[in-house]
Amino acid sequence: MLTRKQYELLRFINERLKESGVPPSFDEMKDALDLRSKSGIHRLITALEERGFIRRLPNRARAIEVIKLPELAASGGGRRGFTPSVIEGNLGKVRRGGGGGADEAERPVAVPVMGRIAAGTPIEALQTCSHTISLPPDMLGAGEHYALEVRGDSMVDAGILDGDMALIQRNPTADTGDIVVALIDDEEATLKRFRRRGASIALEPANAAYEVRILPPNRVQIQGRLVGIYRKY
């Protein structure tokens, strides 16, 4: 399965080849995927080549051949329950009862922004609400939610970019494979993919430039699960 960014890049290369017969430059790929550096494109190209979707031709500049496309193009990134560039349900905290009627149902819900979260080197956890963002009611579901501003690029291959607003469902537990807010040693907060490895916890980046952190459970507190990304263009 491809991540969303891998699929977007593969589609962009394929469309450019069909239009002009020449693959896009790395700068064009970077701009098309809204990445900050070409190193992210290099990693995506390598991943696509390793999975057999493209082939780089030796001794030729900008020589990329698309070998195949995913059978289920609509599936995007293959991450269950999370589509990085789209805000999906379970956002905010639903207030039930009270008979507010149609006007109440259409009123935007304010979700608190609790500070910054590192997608890179963990940063000091922030616990105070700096402001709120308003979300439409059709995106709401049960449970309490908050938002954190993403800082860093360690989750770019999961479609999470520096400056995005991560929408978090407050929850002290997580399933293997979930992207979570992890508090380390009661001091540092980071956004990573959660996995259990024997008696330890692995916090995995989605960027080959960063290392997986393996920690004992007593050093890690799960403070919520990622349910969506809010991005301004």
From Swiss-Prot:
The UniProt entry, under CDD domains, shows: S24_LexA-like
**Active site per the UniProt annotation:** S154, K192
User: Is Hydrolase given among the entry's keywords?
Assistant: yes
Q: Name one GO molecular function term.
A: DNA binding
Residue ranges of the annotated DNA-binding region, renumbered to this chain: 26-46
Single GO BP term = proteolysis
Chain positions of site Cleavage: A119, G120
- Assigned EC number: 3.4.21.88
Which Gene3D superfamilies does the record cross-reference, listed alphabetically? Umud Fragment, subunit A (2.10.109.10), Winged helix-like DNA-binding domain superfamily/Winged helix DNA-binding domain (1.10.10.10)
> What catalytic activity does the UniProt entry give for this protein?
Hydrolysis of Ala-|-Gly bond in repressor LexA
Which keywords belong to this entry? Answer: Autocatalytic cleavage, DNA damage, DNA repair, DNA replication, DNA-binding, Hydrolase, Repressor, SOS response, Transcription, Transcription regulation
Concerning its family, UniProt says: Belongs to the peptidase S24 family.
Q: What NCBIfam families does the entry give?
A: lexA
What job does the chain carry out? Represses a number of genes involved in the response to DNA damage (SOS response), including recA and lexA. In the presence of single-stranded DNA, RecA interacts with LexA causing an autocatalytic cleavage which disrupts the DNA-binding part of LexA, leading to derepression of the SOS regulon and eventually DNA repair.
HAMAP family found in the cross-reference section: LexA (MF_00015)
* Subunit composition and interactions: Homodimer.
Q: Tell me what this protein is called.
A: LexA repressor
Which organism is the protein's source? Answer: Nitrobacter winogradskyi (strain ATCC 25391 / DSM 10237 / CIP 104748 / NCIMB 11846 / Nb-255)
Gene label: lexA
